Amino acid sequence: TYGIVHPREQWATQRDMRRSPFYAREEAAGAKFFDARGWERPQWFTSNEKLISKFKDACEARPHEWDARWWSPITNAEHLQMRESVGMVDLTAFNEFDFTGPGAMKFLQYMCVNNVDVEVGRSVYTPLLTPGGGFRGDLTIMRLSAEHFRVITGAFDGGRDNYWFKRHMPNDGSVTFTDMSSALCTIGVWGPNAEKTMAKIVTGDHKAFDVSQKNFPYGAVREVLIGGVPCTMFRISYVGENGWEVYTKMEHGLRLWDSIAKAGEEFGIIPVGMGVYAVTGRIEKGYRLMGAELESEYNPVEAGLNRPKVKSADFIGKAAYMKAREEKPCAIMCTLEMIDNKSKAGIKRYPTGGNEPILTKSGDRIVDAKGRVSRVTTAGAAPSLGKYLMLAYLTPEHAVEGNELRVMYMNELFPVRVARVGSQPLFDPTDARMKS
């Protein structure tokens, strides 16, 4: 006999290998820790269980044990509280790589699809490509000075990206690579009251610092003091809310956490788990994830991440990328919504995002011109929308808004509808909540 591994299954051994400086506060708040490449990372907090009664209509329990395994309705409550006020997320498992030296900008231009030659204090989102034009990485870059760039990549992507960058490093001494991942900790602060929270404690040159969008726009990076702690604030969001990623040295982390928590008390600030950051908040915005939507067999055009113009500088995968831009895509990333999730037995089911097949209305497989089968890459609740969503690549003929399809889950077909084609999200499609 053999066991079937749940897509969200957690390791039972070799735990507690890496802890953020916030661990004691998180443990006291009843964090349910998941493993993230050795890091203990909160998925949800039992201290937020009281919010279920506040948002009860959006926090239904899942009746089937398999669907409910490694999940909690607390996640939906945390999601809605953050959308209503403000939440703080432990992002210490991020990987941070510093590139410095006179050749740093030229090197990163060659590695990255998008233009990294931005002003100091600005940032850029960019994929990394394979020579064949598929996804090799997905990251953001902050320009901290003329010859200092900081690359931010995901918890599970650091080893791969570290290798890829080092493999292509020039050997003339013009670029220095420093892995800062074990030196820095990170807190995400997001929500309508994030600005009010941070305005109380952020200073620059020992005086109040204006954190408004006018002075501190989306994508900007600033060096500040927060509760006396030197920090790098980066205005960006992966959950579709106004706010920042805040970076500081590990030894300052606990004071930073306590300063933000105290400042946000009057707004009902809560700790928020990765169930919101990595699933519900992300899927409402249709954001792609490396290793899920972004894989080497798909390209930026298919993922809806191609930009209107391509930089003149050469980069890895450029020829293949230019060719893909000229051709009709074989597949398009889409957002699907479940129409009816009741099984034949009358039980509400919730696909886990474990590569469930997407089929035609008549139950036939959807296969693109390259032989790739349509499947669910991410699935999760969208509490702000009252929907259950999935992301999947579809062929152009099926990638039509309103088109009805089927998802196979536990050998049963459930009706789904194409809600969005491409990168436009269902939630806040103009990004007003993040950028105004």
Residue ranges, per PLM feature:
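Glycine/proline-enriched, intrinsically flexible loops and inter-domain linkers
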Residues: 1-436
